[in-house]
Curated annotation (Swiss-Prot):
Domain (BAH) ranges: 616-771
Highest taxon listed in the record's lineage: Eukaryota
Organism: Mus musculus (Mouse)
InterPro entries per the UniProt record, alphabetical: BAH_dom (IPR001025), BAH_domain-containing (IPR053032), BAH_sf (IPR043151)
Pro residues: bias regions: 280-289, 340-352
GO MF, one annotated term: chromatin binding
Segments crossing the lipid bilayer: none
Function per UniProt: Heterochromatin protein that acts as a transcription repressor and has the ability to promote the formation of large heterochromatic domains. May act by recruiting heterochromatin proteins such as CBX5 (HP1 alpha), HDAC5 and MBD1. Represses IGF2 expression by binding to its CpG-rich P3 promoter and recruiting heterochromatin proteins.
Start-end of Basic and acidic residues biased regions: 147-158, 170-182, 189-199
Protein name: Bromo adjacent homology domain-containing 1 protein
């Protein structure tokens, strides 16, 4: 209050009429009332000024402070948690003033406003009332009945203040407040509830929503039907609706198991009369129909662990972990739908098409599937959205169907004349919906199907689809080619095993990896292809060979005609020479462990020390040039021979080798980050492979940096016409000198001499500085 207002107060109170009315009007807006002021107090302007000075801006009251302060405190406690009846209010101590009667003046009722309870407190109270009421036992009910003999409580029950009924409240009852559920509430709280019922109604609705959410999880805590009948309660379900998963914005009931036998009851004569038609609308009749079950009934064992799979492009649902008192569900799983396009397949056995499931499928060679999920679209009984063999068993493939497997079926658009029969190999589990007239899914069926042969139903699926807990664990289950774990993805040609750049330049397409479809013998026998294919073609698609022996070797490996067994046909030695392009083994053969492709460990093979053709001898540990394409201009590959052996199946001479990588074969092209490579520089690697000796073009030499420098100096000396050195200044040592067959002859073409200074890690695509 401003200073001007204070100065005007004496002037207003000094008038002849109504001396105290303005002051009392102002005081009534901020104090409890003015009738408590003592009548003998002088009403002078000084007294009014002092009274304004002590107004409760500083929380100070008038002379009768103690009674008024205690009275306000007791009023608050009485409105929040006061006595249960009027008789208890009379039993208060005599030294304390009595609370104001409910028949006080309208002025006091308008002034005294009780403190509103917080919504959190109301929520907790309403929720506790609903939950604690469900946990009441017969002994607790008896205790409350015996406690009802109190005269005060009997009078309160007669007036309808609260009720001891254990019947669970409906939504309409909850809307009026939780007064009928909580005996702790005061009977005089009805007036306050009539004045402001919104918080309690909101709390009751919140409690009802919490009860809905916890209804399925708290099923073990629900009293049995026998106890309900003993307590005189109704056995009809009290929850009018059940939360349901939505498919494309439409409600669909969840499939549940029966309370007694584990299976829901079917329509009339489901198995006895298969020709009877499915009713167009689920019945809402009295409970005397033995074959139908209301969808709102709470069953004892719901299909909680495995919710139905929402088909039609919807993601799968994860089952919740087990809770105390429930049957432990299957491990936490997650099903994923495949992303590859669905092939056109024959229709699956559908309800209403008895010819499709006239009998069990045969063929025990495949593992039986547990069940399948069926989705009926809006175009009739056809597989919508997902057609390729929708056999989705829960967990791993097993011949025993899981108990919680289910089928989500939505034949809402099925005409009434289409019969919905029970397949002969499955037991029905289904439930019907309430709102069949709405545009939603009206029927949910659970058809556990045990198929022993997928091809019988699907007409031969081109894809394997074993869906497990982790979905598609690897691409190998979809029959996609993958390199084996023991053999890394090498830059070799996919069909021939020769190296190609793992990451080619930008203008060159990325080559394909070696596929398991190609046979190892064909890979080993064929000639290497070009490492840099022409523009517009992929190296992985090249199948042409550089020599004619490849076609002959492929024809030789084909299975012989049944009229001429292979053992009776003679095998001339000249044919082996053609197969090996003229290379023949030299020396005696011996058994030796050599590297063989697709073998985890070195295999014992009949080995040789050298091969010979037209007087040229190539030994083990020599370096050779291998053909890379049909054209002579194709750059050959460089490899070092580690073993020469004979293939026991075809008798062909094979060689195990280690690849040398050219600069254009490296990852990133011909410009590695370490240094600028020389013209004839190659990079050693630990990339092992096998190939036929028929791909050998000629012998070459790979030298160290010092040896290559000496070779270049000698070549320059010979080019200048200087005489070569005839005698050595230092006699060579037999232990440390290069063997004569590995020394570079003086008349060797410089194009056949290579320099190797570094090792290339083909797995990581980098050059090793310090190879170990």
């Amino acid at each position: 209050m401003t200073h001007t207002r204070r100065k005007s107060l004496p002037m207003l109170s000094s008038g002849p009429t109504g001396r105290g009315e303005p002051l009392q009007m102002e005081d009534s807006n901020m104090e409890q009332g003015t009738e408590d002021v003592e009548p003998g107090m002088p009403e002078s302007p000084g007294h009014l000024t002092g009274r304004r000075k002590n107004y409760p801006l500083r929380k100070r009251s008038l002379v009768p402070e103690k009674p008024k302060a205690c009275k306000v405190l007791l009023t608050r406690l009485e409105n929040v948690a006061g006595p249960r009846s009027a008789d208890e209010a009379d039993e208060l101590p005599p030294d304390l003033p009595k609370p104001p009667s409910p028949t006080s003046s309208s002025e006091d009722a308008g002034l005294v406003q009780p403190r509103k309870r917080r919504l959190a407190s109301l929520n907790a109270e309403a929720l506790n009332n609903l939950l604690l009421e469900r946990e009441e036992t017969s002994s607790l009910a008896g205790a409350r009945r015996s406690r009802g003999g109190d005269p005060h409580r009997s009078r309160d029950r007669a007036t309808g203040s609260w009720s001891f009924s254990k019947k669970r409240p409906r939504l309409g009852d909850l809307g009026e407040g939780s007064r009928d559920l909580s005996p702790e509430l005061a009977p005089d709280e009805g007036a306050r509830r009539d004045g402001d019922p919104a918080p309690k109604r909101l709390a009751s609705l919140n409690a009802a929503a919490f009860l809905k959410l916890s209804q399925e999880r708290e099923l073990p805590l629900r009293p049995s039907r026998a106890q309900a009948e003993a307590d005189g309660r109704s056995t009809e379900p009290l929850a009018p609706r059940i939360l349901r998963p939505k498919v494309n914005g439409k409600n669909c009931p969840k499939a549940r198991q029966g309370a007694g036998s584990g299976e829901a009851t079917g329509p009339p004569n489901w198995q006895e009369q298969p020709d009877e038609r499915w009713p167009s609308a689920p019945p809402h009749g009295p409970p005397t129909q033995p074959s139908h079950q209301a969808p709102g009934k709470a069953l004892e064992n719901p299909l909680r662990p495995n919710l139905p799979l929402l088909m039609g492009g919807q993601a799968a649902l994860k089952p919740e972990p087990g809770r105390p008192g429930e049957e432990s569900p299957a491990p936490k799983q997650e099903l994923h739908q495949p992303s590859f396009p669905a092939p056109q397949l024959s229709p699956l056995p559908m309800p209403g098409n008895p010819a499709d499931y006239s009998g069990p499928c045969g063929g025990p060679e495949l593992t039986a599937l547990g069940s399948f999920y069926l989705y009926c679209g809006q175009d009739g009984l056809q597989c919508g959205a997902y057609s390729p063999c929708p056999m989705l068993p829960e967990g791993k493939l097993s011949p025993v169907a899981a108990p919680n497997e289910g089928l989500l079926m939505a034949p809402s658009s099925v005409p009434s004349g289409v019969p919905f029969q029970h397949p002969p190999w499955s037991a029905p589990r289904y439930c019907s919906s309430e709102d069949t007239g709405a545009n939603g899914y009206s029927i949910c069926g659970v058809l556990p199907l045990s198929l022993t042969h997928i091809g019988t139903t699907c007409g031969g699926c081109p894809y394997k689809m074993p869906f497990t807990a982790e979905g598609c664990r690897s691409l190998g289950q979809l029959e996609f080619p993958l390199p084996e774990a023991g053999h890394p993805a090498s830059p070799a040609h996919p069909l021939l095993g020769c190296p190609v750049p793992s990451v080619p330049p930008a203008a060159e397409p990325i080559p394909h990896l070696q596929t398991p479809i190609s046979e190892p013998q064909t890979v080993a026998r064929a000639c290497p292809q070009s490492a840099k294919p022409p523009s517009g073609s992929k190296s992985g698609l090249r199948t042409g060979s550089s020599c004619r022996h490849t076609v002959r070797s492929k024809a030789a490996r084909r299975p012989s005609h049944p009229k001429q067994p292979r053992a009776q046909r003679p095998r001339p030695r000249r044919r082996r020479r053609r197969r090996t392009n003229g290379w023949v083994p030299v020396g005696a053969a011996c058994e030796k462990a050599v590297y063989v492709l697709d073998e985890p460990e070195p295999a014992i093979r009949k080995s040789y020390q050298a091969v010979e053709r037209h007087g040229e001898t190539i030994r083990v540990r020599d370096t050779v040039l291998l053909k890379s394409g049909p054209r002579k201009t194709s750059t050959p590959y460089v490899a070092k021979i580690s073993a020469l052996w004979e293939n026991p199946e075809s008798g062909e001479l094979m060689m195990s080798l280690l690849w040398y990588y050219r600069p254009e074969h490296l990852q990133g092209g011909r410009s590695p980050s370490m240094h600028e490579p020389l013209q004839n520089e190659v990079f050693a690697s630990r990339h092992q492979d096998q190939n036929s000796v028929a791909c050998i073009e000629e012998k070459c030499y790979v030298l160290t940096f010092a040896e290559y420098c000496r070779f270049c100096a000698m070549a320059k000396r010979r080019g200048e016409g200087l005489p070569s050195r005839k005698t050595a200044l230092v006699p060579p040592s037999a232990d440390y000198s290069t063997p004569p067959h590995r020394t570079v002859p003086e008349d060797t073409d410089p194009e056949l001499v290579f320099l190797c200074r570094h090792v290339y890690d083909f797995r990581h695509g980098r050059i090793l500085k310090n190879p170990q």
